């Protein structure tokens, strides 16, 4: 849920992406009349078939034309100043270069596990599998562990109001 970095209230249509060493997943996200997030068509692309993220985004937008106001991509690898040397790929994903190449004014690149951590607050009880029953603290800290091409983790600190 990389889109939370951009605050949906500030934008209309947002392109959201999960950029991994094996696959890249893109989807458009918009709000319905009640202000609830609506996920558009989710498309998966084999990352290694492309020279860079911009090629995949261009293909996605040809297949799913939309007026995108902002984009946020969770990338597998360390991110510093909006730039990620992706793990298991030869790509460098840079938010300024993407903004220029795609003509999207607001582009953010964050770590993929940071992106997942933002999405934790959107989960409902039906989305959660309890591994170790106990008495959870509903307003406590949270952690995300994600096995994939690599193993990622992210922690979330609850400050009493938000993560």
Can you annotate each of these PLM segments?
Residues 131-163:
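Glycine/GP-enriched mid-protein hinge/lid loop-to-helix segment characteristic of carbohydrate kinases
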Residues 9-59:
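Short glycine-rich, Thr/Ser-proximal phosphate-binding strand/loop in the N-terminal lobe
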Residues 2-5:
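Acidic, Ala/Val/Gly-enriched low-complexity intrinsically disordered segments
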Residues 19, 113, 149:
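Active-site metal-binding loops of divalent metal-dependent hydrolases
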Residues 64-109, 114-127, 144:
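Short beta-strand-loop/turn "lid" adjacent to the catalytic site in phosphate-handling enzymes
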Residues 11-12, 104-105, 138-142:
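Short coil/turn connectors at secondary-structure junctions
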Residues 30-33, 82, 157-161:
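Short acidic-glycine loop/turn motifs at beta-strand connectors
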Residues 24, 78-80, 150-154:
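Short, acidic Gly/Pro/Ser/Thr-rich loop/turn segments
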